[in-house]
Amino acid sequence: MKNMISRRNFLAAAGVVAAAGVLTACGGSSSTAASTAAASGSTAAAASGDTIKVGVMGPLSGNVSVYGQAVVNGATLYLKQVNANGGINGKQIEILTEDEQGDATQAVNCFTKMVDEGMTALIGDVTTTPTLAVVAESADYNMPMVTASATAEAVTYDAETDTVNENVFRATFTDPFQGIKMADYAYQRLGYTKAAVIFKKGADYNEGLAENFVNEFESLGGTIVDQESYSEGDVDFKTQLTTILGKDPETVFCPNYYEEVGQILSQAESVGLTVPFLGGDGWDGLEGYASNDQL
């Protein structure tokens, strides 16, 4: 039988987790020391007497590790400051850290492990698909959790049942907001009337931004001249980019994560597609995967 968290403990844990999530959302890049500590699996803050166990989870390795490391670093910094100032109601926070490697199944496994270790609240997950998997699992425990970066609307709201996920908090914007605002910027501010889109199919984040960009751009009077997709694991995008080139867009919306975006920008240049590319928050970290001339 799953242990439900009491309302009193829920509110106390949710408060500190929400504060840590806000700090994390404003955080920057990772440090080697913090990454090394996180990779060990569990980092316990100096504790005296009773402790409150808070889980911190993200992709500390893999293709989107820059995001996971930033979340762990920001959350750990804040929680250590809470401990230094006396903790919560005299109790110190013990930080449980897990690397879900950017994988939804692994994320659920990490969540379950931390629950078994006595976690009372979670900071995480980080990217959209793993977060959605953890959200579904966390509801059974009434586990307070806050994500600093997962942008799918379904993280906090179930459209099929028209219900809010009451145990889940978000310290960032949503996919509809990003997609709509970028379409507004492209059409109204930059003056583009013809756009193409390239995105990863089957990925909640990528498809969510693409759909909202397309709908808004067309509603403003713009034309989507082409929509190209690719699959998980693809590294050659020249076919899609050549097709886009033939449709003569003024811009390309590329709502993907930084590593793939870097490859796409490089290959676009090689096929002669030199129009401006636009994207979402998944481009954070792109500097290490694209040249200054491409940015």
Protein language model features and the residues they cover:
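N-terminal secretory signal peptides
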Residues: 1-25
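Bacterial lipoprotein signal-peptidase II cleavage site
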Residues: 26-36
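Immediate post-signal peptide segment of exported/extracytoplasmic ligand-binding proteins
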Residues: 34-58, 87-92, 187-193
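Extracytoplasmic "Venus flytrap"
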Residues: 48, 55-74, 98-104, 126-127, ...
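Short, polar/charged alpha-helical segment
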Residues: 64-89, 211-216
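Beta-alpha junction/loop-to-helix N-cap segments that form part of ligand/metal-binding clefts
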Residues: 66-71, 85-158, 230-235, 262
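Extracytoplasmic ligand/sensor domains, especially the bilobed periplasmic-binding protein
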Residues: 119-227, 276-294
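Hydrophobic alpha-helical
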Residues: 128-139, 235-238, 242, 247-271
